[in-house]
Amino acid sequence: KFGEARQDLTIKELAEKFLALKETEVAKTSLNTYRAVIKNILSIIGEKNLASSINKEKLLAVRKELLTGYQIPKSNYIVTQPGRSAVTVNNYMTNLYAVFQFGVDNGYLADNPFKGISPLKGSRTIPDPLSREEFIRLIDACRNQQAKNLWCVSVYTGIRPGELCALGWEDIDLKNGTMIIRRNLAKDRFTVPKTQAGTNRVIHLIKPAIDALRSQMALTRLSKEHIIDVHLREFGRTEKQKCTFVFQPEVSAKVKNYGDHFTVDSIRQMWDAAVKRAGIRHRKSYQSRHTYACWSLTAGANPAFIANQMGHADAQMVFQVYGKWMSENNNAQVTLLNTQLSEFAPTMPHNEAMKS
């Protein structure tokens, strides 16, 4: 037995107490993430085991299973290989550490068995953007104009999938070429965007995004305006917002049981189908966001500008996520510099007379 517990609780009971208090501290989306991660871990560690019986050896065994074992995929998800990345496993273990530390802080456990366990070493996953040719094939493979418009807006703005689902015409000013991101769709409810920096951010639209939105305007701009409840970060608070959804299943649905707006799962399925029809290498739909960032960086956009567009607090996140990708694309940067700077270079003589 590891340490002396003041009150014997199963690991499930301890986790439930931890989550109950977290409910008032974090946004609903974050709470759902906590719950999902802890549920996965409990299925491995054994929810009926006493929390006080979990030792370092058991935790290392759990970590190994997370790293190498098969995971149960969500509905319609494609799992290409067993295990999880080191970054994901470290995130899971951090959540479990928080549960045990909660137990120590509140007198349920005498000590935290995580002492002496260091995070796994691992590199961040390198973004895997679409090439221009792949993107054209993807768009050509879309079966209706709305799908083409949706993926053009996604790739040329870099907004998150949930933000795309929750986008309303009230948020868009095509005359000034701007879009305000006010909300996100998480699970079955509307929330504020994932980060504080991403909330009410103004996205400056480039021409391909404007063209796609003008095309979509003919399909949905005059549709029904909805009054929706948006859950704020402060516990229990909501705000009513007007929203005429930009992308609507009704426009392209082949069946009648559609909702007023797309879900993250439904646009992911749309992506997977288009990727398969296009005959391009499979990627997750979130790579549409990475494609925007990578294309923008290659085009010479300021990382701080890209960070603002994508809802990051500062350019540091851009360097963290895309730094390795940027270093592996130095040739593109050299080409860009040659294009942009060569015209300003003075003409240099190359005859033998100058060599002295």
Residue ranges and their predicted role:
Residues 13, 17, 36-40, 61, ...:
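Generic recognition of well-ordered alpha-helical segments
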Residues 4-7, 19-102, 106-108, 124, ...:
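N-terminal core-binding DNA-recognition domain of tyrosine site-specific recombinases/integrases
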Residues 121, 129, 185, 310-336:
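Catalytic-site neighborhood detector that most strongly recognizes the C-terminal catalytic loop/helix
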Residues 75, 140, 144-145, 157, ...:
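Short, basic (Lys/Arg/His-rich) helix/loop patches that form interaction surfaces
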